[in-house]
Amino acid sequence: MLQGKIAIVTGGAKGIGRYASHTLAQAGATVVIVDVDVERMHKTLGELRDLKFEAWAVAADVRHEDEVRRMVHQVVERFGQIDVLLNDAGIVPHFNWGIPRWPRVRFLSKDFWDSVIQTNLGGTFLCTKYVVPFMESRRAGNIVNLWGGGRAENHGAAAYVVSKDAIRTFTRFVAEEEREWNVCVVAFSPKQAIATEDAPEEARNRLPGPECLGNGFVLAAQAGMNLTGKTVEHRDGNIVAID
C-alpha cells in the first residue's frame, strides 16, 4: 500500500509512535524514526530491521529548529523525497494511568508550560515547515498530526489540551495553504486513552494498547484531498472525518 513511500515518524521510538512506525513499515513504507531518546530509537529501528523492513533513524529534538532542519535535509539527501510526515512527538499527561503528575494552572511553572507547548505544538510546526517544500516540489504528500487527548478535562491538563487543540487549528490552516500543491493534512484522533509499553501494569490491564488503532495510520497516510483539514479517526477498517 505504501511501497516506495518515505515516511517520517516523529516520536517514533516508543508508544503510539512506535506502533505507527511498525504499521507503516508493514504497509511497505521506508520509515524514518525521529526521536530524542537515542537508545529507544535504535531499539525500535532494530525491531523493524529484524523484521526485514526498510527503516532508518535520525536523532533530533523537535523543539529545536536547527535540529529539525538538519533532520529533514538528511532524509532528503538519503532518499530524495518525503511522502509522509507523522507528527507524533509530544509530552503527554497520563491521568488515566492513575498518576496525576501535572499541576493545576496556579502551580504550573512557565518552564513546564513552554516545554509542553514547544514539543507538542512547536515540534509539529517546525517539522511541517521544513517538510512541505519537498512535498510541494513533487505536488504530493500526506501530513498526519496526532490529536490524541484533546478532549481531556482533568485538572492539570491545560498545557496539553491547549497544545492539542491548537494542532487541530494548525491542521486546518496548513491544509488550506497546501491544497493547491495536492498535500493532504489531517489530524488523527485515537478516540480514547491508550496505555503504551511504559504504562503501569494496572493501566495496561485496564486500557487498550496502540493495537486498537489497527491500520489507522496507514489509511491516514493515504488520505485523499477530500479529507484535508479534517480531524479523522479509525472506524471499522476505514478513516472517517469527525468534524
Language model features: what each stretch is:
Residues 5, 53-54, 81-82, 135-147, ...:
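Active-site loop of short-chain dehydrogenase/reductase
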Residues 38-39, 59-73, 110:
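The beta1-alpha1 cofactor-binding region of Rossmann-like NAD(H)/NADP(H)-dependent oxidoreductases
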Residues 96-105, 112-114:
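Substrate-binding pocket helix/loop in short-chain dehydrogenase/reductase
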Residues 104-110, 142-166, 171-172, 176-179, ...:
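Catalytic loop of short-chain dehydrogenase/reductase
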Residues 180-183, 187-191, 202-243:
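C-terminal helical subdomain
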